[in-house]
Amino acid sequence: MGSRASTLLRDEELEEIKKETGFSHSQITRLYSRFTSLDKGENGTLSREDFQRIPELAINPLGDRIINAFFSEGEDQVNFRGFMRTLAHFRPIEDNEKSKDVNGPEPLNSRSNKLHFAFRLYDLDKDDKISRDELLQVLRMMVGVNISDEQLGSIADRTIQEADQDGDSAISFTEFVKVLEKVDVEQKMSIRFLH
């Protein structure tokens, strides 16, 4: 089965994905195999429904938000390259990557890109700030009915009050980064991919 995956990916495509995402040859081959097993329509793309069949996403309270991150605006299918680009945000940063070429593009799994990815999970209307309502929606997704609306409102208000530095009653990306400056985002937003 692994050989099927490697034969369908051209060497040049494999090299481009490797360069763009930082995944190893064997990781790309393994993830391609996973991609094709999820591709129920066998058309080389995944739909939202394909993602919803992944048990870990189905039970994750933010599963729908994570699934949405795989799709470009207005798109309802994602190809293998787009799939890999999104997964690259969750690739752990290796020691040898910390001293990468400063003139090259920033790796998709950099702290900055991981923070942008996390910010987009909260910024539901894509206006580059997290409003009280957006924060409430995400909190509601995470805790369900276990906490009253009043308590959730209090948590949202306190969070915005602590993070909002410019007084606009919302959290900008800069404010989001400031709040998370002491959080090990690189570790918390990483998934170990087998080599």
Curated annotation (Swiss-Prot):
Subunit structure: Interacts with PPP3CA. Interacts with SLC9A1/NHE1 (via the juxtamembrane region of the cytoplasmic C-terminal domain); the interaction occurs at the plasma membrane in a calcium-dependent manner and at a domain that is critical for growth factor stimulation of the exchanger. Monomer. Interacts with STK17B; the interaction occurs in a calcium-independent manner and induces the translocation of CHP1 from the Golgi to the nucleus. Interacts with GAPDH; the interaction is direct, occurs in a N-myristoylation-dependent manner and facilitates the ability of CHP1 to bind microtubules.
Gene Ontology CC, one term: microtubule cytoskeleton
UniProt name for this protein: Calcineurin B homologous protein 1
Coiled-coil residue spans: none
Source species: Rattus norvegicus
Residues linked to a lipid group, N-myristoyl glycine type: 2
This protein's encoding gene: Chp1
Protein function: Calcium-binding protein involved in different processes such as regulation of vesicular trafficking, plasma membrane Na(+)/H(+) exchanger and gene transcription. Involved in the constitutive exocytic membrane traffic. Mediates the association between microtubules and membrane-bound organelles of the endoplasmic reticulum and Golgi apparatus and is also required for the targeting and fusion of transcytotic vesicles (TCV) with the plasma membrane. Functions as an integral cofactor in cell pH regulation by controlling plasma membrane-type Na(+)/H(+) exchange activity.
Sequence motif Nuclear export signal 1, residues: 138-147
Keyword Ion transport part of the UniProt annotation: no
